[in-house]
Amino acid sequence: MSLLTEVETYVLSIIPSGPLKAEIAQKLEDVFAGKNTDLEALMEWLKTRPILSPLTKGILGFVFTLTVPSERGLQRRRFVQNALNGNGDPNNMDRAVKLYKKLKREITFHGAKEVALSYSTGALASCMGLIYNRMGTVTTEVAFGLVCATCEQIADSQHRSHRQMATITNPLIRHENRMVLASTTAKAMEQMAGSSEQAAEAMEVANQARQMVQAMRTIGTHPNSSAGLRDNLLENLQAYQKRMGVQMQRFK
């Protein structure tokens, strides 16, 4: 795996699934391929994206700044600086300085990532902030190692919370989770339908699922009534895809 492929993998792992993730993936590909060279426009686009947490925006802003060639005097962006200040915690800043000194001695991506993984997410963010604000310099490879270590920690905590959701036994939470997943699956079906001949059929199935979820939420239903709702929807989606000659692996 090349360095940039690895960076793209780690960064995308912390972004919630949806149309925005696909858009960000495209931006990263363009940036890494040298196709997008307007850093200012890129940062303006990033700043106004919905859904993303400030820290995720900070990490993406840091990656764009590292990768896109820019004029020397280009202003640093406040939204990135605020996201990478370690919540203003002086302990994070102290640890970030210690980490920075260690990173100065590293020359490889993997070496930097290994060193960085033993620090907290707050310290890692602060260390990125130091480099972003030009208070310290490391090689691009080392900076990418720092980015990937931060993403790995964030992805780990997200994975833990997903696992907790999967093992929750509270029927009300499970019921609501099934309905939310059914809604997002319906949305995906509508987006994939496009303008094909069978699009109307896919839209109809998605629409019925939405109406069912809406009705269940409006009148209130027994928590078990949503069981199988998302699975039925997925079966419909996969049958539709087979006819379209599209195979969507691991949608579940």
Swiss-Prot record:
Its gene is M
Would you say which domain of life the source belongs to?
A: Viruses
Which residue intervals make up region (Membrane-binding)? 1-164
The entry describes its oligomerization and partners as: Homodimer and homomultimer. Interacts with NEP. Binds ribonucleocapsid by both interacting with genomic RNA and NP protein. May interact with HA and NA. Cannot bind NP without genomic RNA.
Q: Where in the cell is it found?
A: Virion membrane; Host nucleus
Q: Which Pfam families match?
A: Flu_M1 (PF00598), Flu_M1_C (PF08289)
Q: Taxonomically, what lineage is the organism?
A: Viruses, Riboviria, Orthornavirae, Negarnaviricota, Polyploviricotina
Q: Which InterPro entries match?
A: Flu_matrix_M1, Flu_matrix_M1_C, Flu_matrix_M1_N, Flu_matrix_M1_N_sub1, Flu_matrix_M1_N_sub2, INFV_M1
Q: Which key words are in the record?
A: Host nucleus, Membrane, RNA-binding, Viral matrix protein, Virion
According to the record, the residues making up region (RNP-binding) are 165-252
What topology does it adopt in the membrane? Peripheral membrane protein
Q: According to its UniProt entry, what is the function of this protein?
A: Plays critical roles in virus replication, from virus entry and uncoating to assembly and budding of the virus particle. M1 binding to ribonucleocapsids (RNPs) in nucleus seems to inhibit viral transcription. Interaction of viral NEP with M1-RNP is thought to promote nuclear export of the complex, which is targeted to the virion assembly site at the apical plasma membrane in polarized epithelial cells. Interactions with NA and HA may bring M1, a non-raft-associated protein, into lipid rafts. Forms a continuous shell on the inner side of the lipid bilayer in virion, where it binds the RNP.
User: For this chain's UniProt record, which GO biological process terms are given?
Assistant: viral budding from plasma membrane
- Miscellaneous: Most abundant protein in virion. When expressed alone can form virus-like particles in transfected cells.
Sequence similarity: Belongs to the influenza viruses Matrix protein M1 family.
Q: Where is this motif: Nuclear localization signal?
A: 101-105
Q: What is this protein called?
A: Matrix protein 1
Q: Which residues cross the membrane?
A: none
User: Which GO MF term does the entry hold, naming one?
Assistant: structural constituent of virion
Can you supply one Gene Ontology CC term for this chain's record? Answer: host cell nucleus
